[in-house]
């Protein structure tokens, strides 16, 4: 194909659960540089409620078609919610694409696992899309974010979530992070502040951020994220928690059991700001209690 007809960028824009491609297509047109080839697959509202595998296959197929049509063109990806989870799966299966991808933008994607999904399917029995949204894909995603320049954008309407997805579950090592106050989960696709954050991110080349310095807080966060059955929680609930241990640097570990018997753990820094929130279901409470006791000695 003549270089005259070649686009400057390929822009993928992927919608999420219970949605069509309309708003994500509109967002892509708002933020895309001139002469961009936009690909915004419509997965179908009903199909987003069940099995993730056909959705991953469909997005992957659209990607292959675009790459074959326009080889060696820089690629930018925008994905919201379930769409971000899908793209993490697609990229994990196609590592050879990573060098061609200029940036990845995730809008309110529960990569660490959705707390609502875990409540719907607490034992992972396979209740619709909850089975897949409740999974922790952070280990997969952080291999990607270490290589591909990534922006995470999350809304904040409750102090710890966008009303649907916890802020904690969207956080990834190496990713640039923007939290937009007053923006709910559904409006991430249309909020002017979100579109502007994407444009600013794209204005100049960005590199993946280095891993955070090792501190008691970062060590505790990494430690608790490995506890079996743990899911990122709403940090706003720290207001109900009690201190169970204080560390030498002023960091505190706090716990809370809600009205449904769900056991929470929080890490609060010396400035009294919650840095991590997680919870386990009933079957994993003993494991979390053991982890808390070990943390008191390890850190």
Region locations from a protein language model:
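Short, charged low-complexity linker/loop segments at the C-terminal edge of domains
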Residues: 203-212
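Serine-dependent carboxylesterase/thioesterase catalytic core
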Residues: 11-15, 22, 31, 37-153, ...
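Post-His helix in hydrolase/transferase enzymes
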Residues: 54, 189-203
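Extended non-globular C-terminal regions
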Residues: 212-299
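A short, charged/proline- and glycine-enriched loop
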Residues: 4-10
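Catalytic histidine-centered segment of alpha/beta-hydrolase-like enzymes
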Residues: 49-50, 184-192, 264
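Typically the conserved alpha-helix immediately C-terminal to a functionally engaged Cys/Sec
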Residues: 27-28
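Active-site-adjacent alpha-helix of alpha/beta-hydrolase-fold enzymes
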Residues: 159-186
